[in-house]
Amino acid sequence: MAASETVRLRLQFDYPPPATPHCTAFWLLVDLNRCRVVTDLISLIRQRFGFSSGAFLGLYLEGGLLPPAESARLVRDNDCLRVKLEERGVAENSVVISNGDINLSLRKAKKRAFQLEEGEETEPDCKYSKKHWKSRENNNNNEKVLDLEPKAVTDQTVSKKNKRKNKATCGTVGDDNEEAKRKSPKKKEKCEYKKKAKNPKSPKVQAVKDWANQRCSSPKGSARNSLVKAKRKGSVSVCSKESPSSSSESESCDESISDGPSKVTLEARNSSEKLPTELSKEEPSTKNTTADKLAIKLGFSLTPSKGKTSGTTSSSSDSSAESDDQCLMSSSTPECAAGFLKTVGLFAGRGRPGPGLSSQTAGAAGWRRSGSNGGGQAPGASPSVSLPASLGRGWGREENLFSWKGAKGRGMRGRGRGRGHPVSCVVNRSTDNQRQQQLNDVVKNSSTIIQNPVETPKKDYSLLPLLAAAPQVGEKIAFKLLELTSSYSPDVSDYKEGRILSHNPETQQVDIEILSSLPALREPGKFDLVYHNENGAEVVEYAVTQESKITVFWKELIDPRLIIESPSNTSSTEPA
């Protein structure tokens, strides 16, 4: 057998080893016959001083690293070796190239080689296709340049100029014709419109004159003719009100309507004063039927004149009240309400009971008294959609079917109409309110600043020194643990800060108080155990640790590092 070659080595640790946490310098007697390479020496040191099997140790002799694959004969007697706990990912799967300068991983080298092979297979086709297309484009461009000669260029410019001139001449002729065609109907329409605007009263004046002539020639048929004329006039005015083409047309119609009824009422009053006997000779049945027809068509009845009997006035008043109810029921929508107001403005101020009747114009706003003896109020046609203040008519009826009508007074039947108390009501206030709000709204350029809470910068624990063994009690350490995540899958946690409460060197168990933030408490899941005590209280054993104190083996800690507090912090914490 070969003689044993024992060597005495002095080992210097950066941090106390797990087996002897109170010292960092040791003497070790090594038999070189048992240690063939430096790796054997490292495994011997790992075994003697309680390092875990996964801990990678590096041996340095006078500042130089002893390669793991070198012979252990490099170590001589009384040599001082520095033992350093290296990072794990430094020397895993490393390939040293001949120069020794570059360290490449096997996986990366394989991937690069595979990519190079694929590139060599696919590149020729791609390059050929790109070159092919580029050469094609270059050839086409060269051909185009060669084909363009100066003569051809001059010919093309001349032909283009001629074409442009021809197009311009044709375009001007066509445009002139089209403009003439367009202007001619427009001019005609404008002329007709101007004529109508200048003479809005001419057809009505003619109708009144014809009516007067017919009255003189045939006095008996004057009442019927007047009713027919009134029907025609009402239909024309309603049609013109329902379909206005523009604002100017509507204004002209308003003027004609405001002037027309007053003239018709004057003529009717004169005729009634001159021929009271002839009108009274007619049968009441015919008058009732004509009044009813007129009320159904127009929705409003003309008030009877002085010469008519009390029976005719009562029948016409009843029919007018019924027609008013029908018209008001149909005017639920804003458009119907607008049409209703316009028709009210048409017949405002026509026939009124009493000798002192005065005509009213439809453009008058609000309410006006018609006369001293009349005692009635007529609504003026207002441009807005809102209804007048009081639209009530007192006919002795006790029921108030429409709340927006005024409270009905009790007047003598056939004599005067009761004055309704003004009750303000607006049918369509939405558009007016919107406009008012838009005008009254004050635009404010106010910006609210939303600031996120200041994120605390994460500590870089990789700069802290690694721990080979458990430090002293009371020291703070940073470590990782293999634990279940919130989805109950095992994973390495982030760095946690903890304080060493106790350490057992024999069992290598460590009690650690976790100082970092714990996860928020939640309801127990499917992997959490719930126990019931005798008193009925529930005890939950979470699969994911929720406690601030843990007891683990030192080997279970991943990358334990010592947290070194700066002297400024320690001095500030100490009492002055």
Swiss-Prot record:
Crosslink site: Glycyl lysine isopeptide (Lys-Gly) (interchain with G-Cter in SUMO2): 127, 151, 160, 204, 209, 274, 281, 293, 297, 444, 496
UniProt-recorded Gene Ontology molecular function terms: identical protein binding; U1 snRNA binding; U2 snRNA binding
Keywords recorded for this protein, A-Z: Isopeptide bond, Nucleus, Phosphoprotein, Repeat, Ubl conjugation
Domain Tudor, chain residue ranges per copy: 460-559
Ranges of Polar residues composition bias in the record: 214-225
Modification sites for Phosphothreonine: 122, 290, 303, 456
UniProt key word Coiled coil: no
InterPro entries in the record: Coilin (IPR024822), Coilin_N (IPR031722), Tudor_Coilin (IPR056398)
Disordered: annotated span: 125-330, 352-389
Pfam families recorded: Coilin_N, Tudor_Coilin
Biased composition range(s): Low complexity: 235-250, 301-320
Region 2 X 4 AA repeats of A-R-N-S, residue ranges: 223-271
Sequence repeats: 223-226, 268-271, 386-389, 413-414, 415-416, 417-418, 419-420, 517-520
Residues covered by region (Required for interaction with SMN): 392-420
Biased composition (Basic and acidic residues): 270-285
Subcellular location: Nucleus; Nucleus, Cajal body
Annotated positions of the Phosphoserine modification: 105, 184, 248, 250, 256, 271-272, 301, 403, 487, 489, 566
Tissue specificity note: Found in all the cell types examined.
Stretches for region 4 X 2 AA tandem repeats of R-G: 413-420
GO process annotations (BP): spliceosomal snRNP assembly
PTM text: Symmetrical dimethylation of arginine residues within the RG repeat region enhances affinity for SMN, and thus localization of SMN complexes to CBs.
Role played: Component of nuclear coiled bodies, also known as Cajal bodies or CBs, which are involved in the modification and assembly of nucleoplasmic snRNPs.
UniProt note: domains: The atypical Tudor domain at the C-terminus contains two large unstructured loops, and does not bind methylated residues.
Subunit structure: Interacts with ANKS1B. Interacts with SMN1 (via Tudor domain). Interacts (via C-terminus) with AK6. Interacts with WRAP53/TCAB1. Interacts with HMBOX1. Interacts with PSME3; the interaction is inhibited by PSME3IP1. Interacts wit UBL5.
Record protein name field: Coilin
Organism lineage: Eukaryota, Metazoa, Chordata, Craniata, Vertebrata
Encoding gene (name): COIL
